[in-house]
């Protein structure tokens, strides 16, 4: 085995990985964009999850409808008093674009990119299932702000039905927290018992907005629904699956979510409750819903009750999400190599805690990973050197047994055994390294911490491409130099051509890769050059290598 052939193998495996990821995201036809002229609300009935009737918001159009803003240090929400939905959510600590003041908007009521968090009470006496339409709550203020010295801000909204039952819907925002408390307090002042059922759902436009579409050369991040249940810790439920069949699952605890690159919104019911999950694609509209219903709540006459829930609206912060609901941190999707990617992300975070620079942390992680893999690298080059020394004897065997492939194979195996050479010794280390690289690829791609994170000089955002393409060019140059360092006995013209163009192909690919990933590959190449130089000097002393 030759190091050049290993480079070809790396390239083919990596390109195949990218093509497979892109095919997975593109294989299903995308629906045509639909302009939504009027928002309509779907609420689940108490009972079967598949039956989600439509309730028009215009049914209660005469009510005095208002928008309320509430801000913490990390969130700015807009609440609609009709129904008490969250129709806008700005993430104050995350900007829309690097270097700009405008905050990133995760939830929005814009018709062409609708994405809202809805909740209410259905059931026999639920205000959201009444014939007159969803309730319009009253609030004391139109603006709420987390003040200095406060740990939380509470927004209470009240509505009283015709029987005198008082429903208070509260939103609780805590300092530094993206988990929103959405609670109902029910004061049954009537003479009859009341039965209600809480639901929370997320509604989103199915068609991906233009600004969220990935580049063709970079594997696209998942955008769609997901849930967690007793059977599945983390299960994606794509928009296409919602079209084929409504989600209908009953489980203890769990959560439902809408995912996109770096950010997630998720309803997390009480872990001890038995909840019903559902989904629905709205007929005639480019919109999908995923949500849950809590158990029925009975409130006797003259009694009070409270229903609580959590709603996460924010970046994919694993440590914080894990505290909100079990397995919610798995929405940071590292794919099937998660068991490698998670420790790599943890190490990256530890390094960043010391140096306070994500680019330097990537360099430190690369040094550690390549250092750990150095014994494999050394074994790889030693095996290849021994194989080169055997080339004359192998050529003689091939010439001697050119008409008898069985005897030729037997002779080669005896030669390998005699010389203590493993013919796969140069290939196996590559097969070990590739899963690590792919896992690191996803660790860097999925880490919201790298979004708008600067490195040095012109690299002001490690999550996007190098604006001046300096890193990809340096990476290509280092790959070319590494290729020139490696001795070769390749005589096949096709393989020679492939090897000549490999650095160019990789340079072109990496032009659109995130700067953080390109930095990793560049540093890895520099380390490879250093390690290869050290190994070759050791092999020269053993007579297994000569400089060309």
UniProtKB/Swiss-Prot annotation:
Membrane protein topology class: Multi-pass membrane protein
Swiss-Prot/TrEMBL keywords: Cell inner membrane, Cell membrane, Chaperone, Membrane, Protein transport, Transmembrane, Transmembrane helix, Transport
Bilayer-crossing regions: 6-26, 349-369, 424-444, 455-475, 503-523
Quaternary structure, from the entry: Interacts with the Sec translocase complex via SecD. Specifically interacts with transmembrane segments of nascent integral membrane proteins during membrane integration.
PANTHER family named among the record's database cross-references: CYTOCHROME C OXIDASE ASSEMBLY PROTEIN COX18, MITOCHONDRIAL (PTHR12428:SF65), OXA1 (PTHR12428)
Taxonomic source organism: Aeromonas salmonicida (strain A449)
Compartment(s) where it occurs, according to its Swiss-Prot or TrEMBL record: Cell inner membrane
Cystine residue pairs: none
InterPro entries, alphabetized: Membr_insert_YidC (IPR019998), Membr_insert_YidC_N (IPR028053), YidC/ALB3/OXA1/COX18 (IPR001708), YidC/Oxa/ALB_C (IPR028055), YidC_ALB_C (IPR047196), YidC_periplasmic_sf (IPR038221)
Cellular component, GO annotation: plasma membrane
Keyword Aminoacyl-tRNA synthetase: no
MF GO annotations: membrane insertase activity
Organism superkingdom: Bacteria
Family: Belongs to the OXA1/ALB3/YidC family. Type 1 subfamily.
Role, per record: Required for the insertion and/or proper folding and/or complex formation of integral membrane proteins into the membrane. Involved in integration of membrane proteins that insert both dependently and independently of the Sec translocase complex, as well as at least some lipoproteins. Aids folding of multispanning membrane proteins.
BP term (GO), one: protein transport
Record protein name field: Membrane protein insertase YidC
NCBIfam families per the UniProt record, alphabetical: PRK01318.1-1 (NF002351), PRK01318.1-3 (NF002352), PRK01318.1-4 (NF002353), yidC_nterm (TIGR03593), yidC_oxa1_cterm (TIGR03592)
Chief location of this protein within or outside the cell: membrane
